[in-house]
């Protein structure tokens, strides 16, 4: 989160790049959209949420904290940039990973810093409409004049957010969506939201149609004696996006307290998009009881990030919100090698055969609305046949439980 004092170059041919103080102006929206009402769980999205890994979140936070600091004016920030970009490049489901360059125009700081990182997953039917989620990867501690030697681990602020965006990309990149998704890591947030501001302004200049921006910044601290909860920060003009987000929270975690609130100090990257005319919101750990250790050498795992289960919950909800708004479509999930299965013919018409090396326990077929079409409970058989003669043409997800685990396959009915 921005403190109180306030490489391919520019992806200008379709992907472009606000930050400032606490007072957020409500710029008119550049585009208007209808937002889905989320009243029931999508089983595919629920399965993805369940796949968010605490171990993975902890490993990401631990690695980011291993740098001396991630200050945007230090030499270490370039190593962090390269590590994050390489990580996104390792995901086969992403189409492009870009470095977005920008200039720092702030007294007392060098003009050059590390880049924003943009990992792009193009939409199938509405590639010109964008759903963006992002987290800043720089950290801050101003207790010394030397930016290269000061210790600023930045666990809660904001390794937790970076870990949540990574989990979202890691899991959603296995699927196809109607709209384009951009997973972002911002630089120079801590000195005035500079990286995200540059990008959001360029997006507005290019008339990019951003349907919604979801921010992740500080979600790992929970005050002793309180239950996991969420404060959602947004301006009233963005209430349609917020209503959808609240739907996601109440549908998937109905017992979790979640409400609108406003930060008494500081700001975060969602404001960049709001000021540039895009709907945006910021889920936050607690505006009145956030980590007291941020911007110090004590912002570490265990002390400042004291509840990884809460970080997991925030990542799950971010994933679900992005997936619902982007629109799940053609499903392409890599099955576990431990669950060797075949679905054929595919595409199918009148019937489909399912063959497994291990015995099948249950076969369930869902359409892309998440509706259960058919379930068959089996007793260790290696093969079953499903009559698909009455299935409408389209794409389906076959969920297979075998004696050796669970697998998912895409099925096309002609």
Model region roles, listed by residue range:
Residues 19, 393-414:
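C-terminal tail/sorting-segment detector
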Residues 26-78, 218-221, 290-299:
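N-terminal capping segment at the start of a domain
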Residues 99, 222-330:
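Active-site-adjacent substrate-binding region
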Residues 112-115, 148-237:
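Acidic/histidine-rich catalytic neighborhood of metal-dependent amide-processing enzymes
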Residues 327-344, 350:
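Residue-level detector of functionally pivotal "anchor" positions at catalytic/ligand-binding pockets or at interdomain
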């Amino acid at each position: 989160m921005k403190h109180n004092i306030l490489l391919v170059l520019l992806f200008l041919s379709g992907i472009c790049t606000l930050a400032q103080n606490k007072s957020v102006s409500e710029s008119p929206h550049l585009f208007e959209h209808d937002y889905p009402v989320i009243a029931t769980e999508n089983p595919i999205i629920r399965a993805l949420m369940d796949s968010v890994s605490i171990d993975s979140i902890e490993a990401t936070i631990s690695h980011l904290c291993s740098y001396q600091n991630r200050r945007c004016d230090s030499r270490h920030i370039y190593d962090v940039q390269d590590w994050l970009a390489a990580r996104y490049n390792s995901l086969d489901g992403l189409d492009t990973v870009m470095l977005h360059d920008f200039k720092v125009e702030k007294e007392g700081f060098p003009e050059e810093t590390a880049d924003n990182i943009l990992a792009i997953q193009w939409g199938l039917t509405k590639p010109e409409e964008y759903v963006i989620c992002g987290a800043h990867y720089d950290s801050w501690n101003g207790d010394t004049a030397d930016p290269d030697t000061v210790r600023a681990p930045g666990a809660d602020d904001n390794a937790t957010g970076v870990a949540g965006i990574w989990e979202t990309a890691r899991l959603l990149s296995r699927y196809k969506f109607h709209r384009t998704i951009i997973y972002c890591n911002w630089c120079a947030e801590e000195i005035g939201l500079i990286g995200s501001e540059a990008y959001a302004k360029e997006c507005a200049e290019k008339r990019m149609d951003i349907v919604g921006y979801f921010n992740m910044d500080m979600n790992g601290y929970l005050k002793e004696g309180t239950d996991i909860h969420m404060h959602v920060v947004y301006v009233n003009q963005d209430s349609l996006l917020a209503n959808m987000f609240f739907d996601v929270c109440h549908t998937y975690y109905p017992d979790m307290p979640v409400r609108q609130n406003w930060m008494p100090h500081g700001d975060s990257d969602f404001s960049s998009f709001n000021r540039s005319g895009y709907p945006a919101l910021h889920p936050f750990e607690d505006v009145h009881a956030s980590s007291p250790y941020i911007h110090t050498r004590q912002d570490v795992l265990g002390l400042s990030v004291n509840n990884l289960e809460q970080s997991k919950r925030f990542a799950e909800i971010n994933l679900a919100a992005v997936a619902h708004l982007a629109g799940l479509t053609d499903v392409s999930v890599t099955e576990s090698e431990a669950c060797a299965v075949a679905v054929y013919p595919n595409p199918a018409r009148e019937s489909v055969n399912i063959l497994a090396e291990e015995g099948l326990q249950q076969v369930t077929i869902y359409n892309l609305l998440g509706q259960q079409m058919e379930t068959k409970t089996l007793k260790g058989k290696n093969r079953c046949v499903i009559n698909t003669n009455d299935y409408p043409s389209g794409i389906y997800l076959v969920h297979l439980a075998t004696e050796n685990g669970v697998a998912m396959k895409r099925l096309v009915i002609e």
